[in-house]
Amino acid sequence: PRNHSSAASDVYKRQQVGCVVNCSFCATGKQGFSRNLTLSEIIGQVLIAENSFRSIDNPKEKNITNVVMMGMGEPLLNFDNVVNAMQIMRHHSAYNLSKRKVTLSTSGLIPEINKLSKVTDVSLTISLHAPNDKLRDILVPINKKYPIKDLLKSVKNYVDSFDDKRITTFEYILIDKVNDSLEIANELANLLKNYPCKINLIPFNEFSLSEYSKPSNNRLRAFKEYLVKKGFITTIRSTRGDDIMAACGQLVGEVKDKTKRKERLKRQVKALELNA
């Protein structure tokens, strides 16, 4: 996606074909995992975006100003290629992007987060989506291996390893009547009250085979306003690409039903009985 309101351009890049994390609100995991992208494929996405932007604006300018490792796949599962790509993008002979202009988003792989501070100092975004382990185990299954308490400790260690004052962004997909109540907003505020952070709310983007729904604008605004009153910098991400099923959580080649064959047959039989 591109920010059309200025000359600045944000590039969201994918790092894998498919995804093994399999968050329940994301279409990407439904297609399974194929492979990691190579270093050249990751950098190639930036070059393609740059050429596209040049055709719109000044053809001689490099106007890519922000790169976010937040597309299809979990960046930290393609650790070496992603780190090398970020280093290239920050090099003065390439895009000369500062550490604050390159962001890595992760679902919370603690060992890789712990390694990250030794090789880079880019901005970190955490796909949180729930304030407690019971709910996050459902939404982000990797939480069963890396629970919230341990994840936040790892994030704090990453931030504290640098001298500058920086904040962590926590991404939070809002799903209707799943994680969007004011009670949950209060729980989220209590969880993050000791962390310098920004909370980025993302309305759920619906896709085929999903059992979830997008929250109403009223519930979305109420959730945000509650967090703001609690003192948090809170934003609502503008949905882009949903008209072509390419918004956050919709990136997929073909949504395939990965349900076990036995369960699929049961559903098919039930459907036939209802239609009989």
Give, region by region, the residue ranges found by the protein language model.
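Conserved alpha-helical substructure of the radical SAM core
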Residues: 30-66
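Single conserved hydrophobic/aromatic residue that forms the stacking wall/gate
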Residues: 1-8, 12
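A structural preference for short, hydrophobic beta-strand core positions in alpha/beta folds
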Residues: 201, 236-238
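Conserved AdoMet/S-adenosylmethionine-binding subsite of the radical SAM
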Residues: 51-57, 63-230
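Flexible, glycine/proline-enriched loop segments at strand-loop-helix junctions
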Residues: 28-37, 72-74, 100-101
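Short beta->alpha linker loops
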Residues: 37, 108, 239-243
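Local cysteine-cluster metal-coordination motifs and their immediate loop/turn environment
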Residues: 14-30
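Radical SAM enzyme core and accessory elements
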Residues: 241-276
